[in-house]
Amino acid sequence: GFARAWLDFSSTYQPQLLLPFQLSMGLMTLFISVGIGASLARQNGLDPVTTGLLCLMSFMLVAAPVKDGAISMQYFSGQGIFTALITAIYAAEVYAFLKRNNITIKLPPQVPTGVARSFEVLIPVLVIILTLHPLNLLLENSTGMILPEAIMSLVKPLVAASDSLPAMLLAVLVCQVLWFA
C-alpha cells in the first residue's frame, strides 16, 4: 500500500528529499557563527555584517578542511556547534578589541567608504588568521585532530553525562528552582 509506495519513492529521490534538511540543519553552524558575530557586534557598537562575516571566516578556517580537493562539510552540522560558538566569540572580541584600541588601517577621507571599510578590517582578519590557523595546524600535527574534533572530544564526557535520566531530572529541577529566584 501507501507505506511501500512511500518507501520506494523516498529511496529513489532521497538526495532531493534531504536537500532542505542539508541546507538548514546541515549548515546550522554557519548560521550560528554569523548570528553570534552580528549580535556581539551590536553589543560592541560594530558593523554586524562585517563582524558576522569575520566570525564565519574564523569558523571555516578551523572547521572546513580540504579533503580530496573539496571542502569537508562534516562540522557544518551539529558536530561543529561548540567550535562555531568559540570561534565566533573569539573573532568578534578580537575585532572589538582592535577597533576599540584603533589598531586598524586608516585611509584619508577622500577614499570611498566601501574601500576604507575593507582596509579597516584587514588587520583583524590577519590577527584572526595568524592565531587560529597555526593553532589548528599545531593541534592537527600533534594530536591528529583539528579544532572541532578536539573540542568534541573534550565535551564528549559532558554530553554523555547529560544524556541520562538523572541529568535530565537535575536540569528540570534547576530550571524550576531558578524560575522563582
Report the location of each language-model feature.
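Signature of multi-pass transmembrane helix bundles
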Residues: 1-9, 13, 17-25, 30-180
